[in-house]
Amino acid sequence: MAALDPITPAGGGTWRFPANEPLRLDSGGVIEGLEIAYQTYGQLNADKSNAVLICHALTGDQHVASPHPTTGKPGWWQRLVGPGKPLDPARHFIICSNVIGGCMGSTGPASINPATGKTYGLSFPVITIADMVRAQAMLVSALGVETLFAVVGGSMGGMQVQQWAVDYPERMFSAVVLASASRHSAQNIAFHEVGRQAIMADPDWRGGAYAEHGVRPEKGLAVARMAAHITYLSEPALQRKFGRELQRDGLSWGFDADFQVESYLRHQGSSFVDRFDANSYLYITRAMDYFDIAASHGGVLAKAFTRARNVRFCVLSFSSDWLYPTAENRHLVRALTAAGARAAFAEIESDKGHDAFLLDEPVMDAALEGFLASAERDRGLV
């Protein structure tokens, strides 16, 4: 099988919360009739011990290993999910859901508010990473899984993994945190604010009610994506890929995209608006900004993981990731160790920046495969 051949999901669709089980949010709000869109790959074994939950990043979705229904592009982590890969449907029952607040089928600001018959827009309640995880836990239960073999995620997905370990440690055997942090830094909040302001400054945003006017703030969302995408890269990677190469034979002596890197960013922005909702971008980036695992534990990160001492952790960082640098990952590992948890850690040398966890990184693949193989032996799966 080719490295990026799609695999067929074993199941999936949309799960609707029972009418008597609304999702209660950290903000004090409630979402009635919440829907969660998800995909599964593989089969649950007889003792239901092989389930793996994959948590996606900011602009990801549930289509982790199958073609995206809008763009037709391969699943965002098809490199690692598939036959003979670290996460193998022949061995694992793999679950991936679109986070609440998202725009790929789970309830979010673009969904219809049953109370009004119109899209939620900004009437959608502000959500947190913990709210996302609470919804995932209910979905996992609905799928017949009590304890997950592993919870795996990178970037915002890694935040969800940590939240699982804090809130539901008894429901997970192992945890893999890639290119993440235990709280959002001031720099990261600042970049998110630039993106949000770009969206809200677009005249077509219409106070978040753009759907009612039949328009979309595409220009603002594209600029937000361009700014964010820079943080996912690294200077060495940009220099290697683009340098100061021109898009054409000579300078335009104007403000068109003279440089290849400019054209690349414009393409990233314009293609992003075809698959993502602007209000979802506001809500999910705000959830990331609010993320601070230690905040509700007296500011002491180790205390947050006290109940997770029986969970096996793997934490991987990348040397050129300046969005979630290695120092922040080491801080997490020290806290896990202080809490009495088993934590394996590695910094992977890479010049690809934050997005390295999504790209071809054989050392990461080997580390992940080795950790999961060890955990499978300890779990009695092999």
From Swiss-Prot:
- InterPro entries, alphabetically? AB_hydrolase_1 (IPR000073), AB_hydrolase_fold (IPR029058), HAT_MetX-like (IPR008220)
Q: What does this protein do?
A: Transfers an acetyl group from acetyl-CoA to L-homoserine, forming acetyl-L-homoserine.
Q: Which family does it belong to?
A: Belongs to the AB hydrolase superfamily. MetX family.
Which GO cellular component terms, listed alphabetically, does the Swiss-Prot or TrEMBL entry include? Answer: cytoplasm
Task: Give the record's keywords alphabetically.
Answer: Acyltransferase, Amino-acid biosynthesis, Cytoplasm, Methionine biosynthesis, Transferase
Q: What is its main location?
A: cytoplasm
Intracellular or extracellular location(s): Cytoplasm
Residues bound to substrate? R225, D355
Q: Which gene encodes it?
A: metXA
Official protein name in the record: Homoserine O-acetyltransferase
**Any one Gene Ontology molecular-function term assigned to this protein's record:** homoserine O-acetyltransferase activity
Active site residues according to the UniProt entry: S155, D321, H354
Provide the top EC class.
transferase
Could you describe the subunit structure of this protein? Homodimer.
This enzyme catalyses: L-homoserine + acetyl-CoA = O-acetyl-L-homoserine + CoA
Question: Which Gene3D superfamilies does its entry note?
Answer: 1.10.1740.110, alpha/beta hydrolase
**According to its UniProt record, in which pathway does this protein act?**
Amino-acid biosynthesis; L-methionine biosynthesis via de novo pathway; O-acetyl-L-homoserine from L-homoserine: step 1/1
Q: What is its EC number?
A: 2.3.1.31
Gene Ontology process terms (BP) = homoserine metabolic process; methionine biosynthetic process
* Record-annotated AB hydrolase-1 domain positions: 50-360
